[in-house]
Amino acid sequence: MQGYGAAMRRGFREAKGDLIMVAEPDGTFRGHDAVKMLAYSDDFEVVYGTRTVKELIWKGANMGLFLKWGNYWVAKLMEFLFNSTSLTDVGCTLRCVRREALLDLQPHFTIDGSFFGPQMMVLSILMKMKMIQIPVNYTKRIGHSSVTGNKWVAFRLGLRMIRMILGYRLRSWLAPHRFPRATRE
């Protein structure tokens, strides 16, 4: 098992806190955005970041028109198909999740690769979790991305995300009770 999703799943299994926050170690996110996410975690089970707000995209950040609009339109497709909260970025890896919500999500994680993030979003929608997406700073990356550094690879990843989203939409219509929440006392 290897890849972004495999690393996330392993980290989630080993995390011990009541709130679990995830950020890639490539320098693209600012530490003070964690404070914003924590503030929203009082009211929401899952807080996702969005890197698509122009004023928070720093010079040198890898968020050109292709990636920005690709992430935006795939997010809007997800929002439309599932009638969810406002979504503007399916690829942002900065997120915060409450332990109880994570315990409900974990049995349904199946993706080890680069589109694990959108799977987590779809599952949190299907499980009717209280979630929100908030704008975060996005800065220049340290090192080269093997995914977003190549437009063709990013385009193919976008198509895989769309296929996965459509698959979940179809499965949720055919078996609407497939994604129950655990009951806790």
Where are these regions (language model features)?
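Acidic metal-phosphate-binding loop of nucleotide-sugar-dependent transferases
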Residues: 27-29
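Phosphate/oxyanion-binding loops and surfaces in catalytic or ligand/nucleic-acid-binding neighborhoods
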Residues: 80, 84, 127, 168
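C-terminal, non-catalytic tails of nucleotide-sugar-dependent glycosyltransferases
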Residues: 160-185
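C-terminal tail/cap regions
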Residues: 139-141, 171-172
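Acceptor/aglycone-binding surface of glycosyltransferases and processive sugar-polymer synthases
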Residues: 2-14, 19, 31-114, 141-156, ...
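DNA-recognition element of transcription regulators
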Residues: 118
